[in-house]
Amino acid sequence: MIKAGTISEVPVTNLDFFPTLLDVAGIVLDPGKVLDGKSLVPVLTGKGVIAERPLFWHFPVYLEGGNMETQDSIFRTRPGSSVRLGDWKLIQYFENNDLELYNLREDIGEKVNRFRSDPAKTTELLAILEKWRRETNAPVPVALNPSFAKP
């Protein structure tokens, strides 16, 4: 068991919850069934690790109006995808192909966009993101929604 107060820096996603619950319950999936997440049991028990892997988020739709009180006033109004690998996170917006690159260890608040100052990391993560979208057949909008404009 992990000691109280232990902090883990292992990046996880909600896709890891189901494989974790299956693992805890001792349920083995049929061969050929694939889950996107990984069991967190090795991390939770302190008896193993989860290999570093890219984590993906894909939001191909227009959803809600802007909130001027937030850091990103048009968050969830524009379609895009993002990938996190290690300390790095890349966001790509589909409307204008804007890219944002953040080093989360140095900038957890995502204030300093480093896509211009770190082109090699931008290229690396963009290639990973584009490959994932192709492999998963992720939908990408091809037309702008004129009802959603930057405030």
Task: Identify the residue ranges that each predicted region occupies.
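C-terminal cap/loop subdomain of S1 sulfatases and analogous C-terminal strand-loop tails that border
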Residues: 1-4, 10, 15-18, 22-100, ...
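C-terminal structured subdomain/cap of oxidoreductase catalytic cores
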Residues: 104, 119-122
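Intrinsically disordered, low-complexity polar regions and short flexible loop motifs
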Residues: 107
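Active-site-proximal N-terminal segment of extracellular/periplasmic enzymes that hydrolyze or transfer
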Residues: 112-120
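Short amphipathic alpha-helical coiled-coil/interface segments
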Residues: 125-129, 133
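Bilobed periplasmic-binding protein-like "clamshell/Venus-flytrap" ligand-binding domains
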Residues: 132-143
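Short, charged, surface-exposed hinge/linker loops at domain edges
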Residues: 141-151
